[in-house]
Amino acid sequence: MIMDLQFFSHHKGGGSTANGRNSAGRRLGTKAADGSIVTAGSIIYRQRGTHINPGENVGRGGDDTLYAKVAGVVKFERMGRSKRKVSVYPVAE
């Protein structure tokens, strides 16, 4: 007579899984807050797509990053009910 006993003193093989990995965050979002002073070329907002549109004195890079074209004060504004834009207004010295 053949008996097959399993005495759970060791873990059996764990097997494998298709899950269990993740990618690092892309550090998107606001880099210069409303009312802050920026220099020309400063990144204001990093995004994928156009969540926020460029306004006065703000350019849009190839990856949709918004940056200041001139030195000044950052101002986030509404465009109607749902859209938003960011502008940079020069400071009078």
From Swiss-Prot:
InterPro entries documented for this protein: Ribosomal_bL27 (IPR001684), Ribosomal_bL27_CS (IPR018261)
Keywords of this entry: Ribonucleoprotein, Ribosomal protein
GO molecular function, one term: structural constituent of ribosome
PROSITE patterns (UniProt xref): RIBOSOMAL_L27
Region: Disordered, residue numbers: 8-29
Pfam family, one: Ribosomal_L27
Xref: Gene3D superfamilies: 2.40.50.100
Record-level GO BP terms: translation
The record's account of how the chain is modified after translation: The N-terminus is cleaved by ribosomal processing cysteine protease Prp.
Prosegment residue ranges: 1-8
GO cellular component, one term: cytosolic large ribosomal subunit
Domain of life: Bacteria
PANTHER family associated with the record: LARGE RIBOSOMAL SUBUNIT PROTEIN BL27M, RIBOSOMAL PROTEIN L27
Family: Belongs to the bacterial ribosomal protein bL27 family.
Protein name: Large ribosomal subunit protein bL27
Native source organism of the sequence: Limosilactobacillus reuteri (strain DSM 20016)
Lineage: Bacteria, Bacillati, Bacillota, Bacilli, Lactobacillales
Annotated gene: rpmA
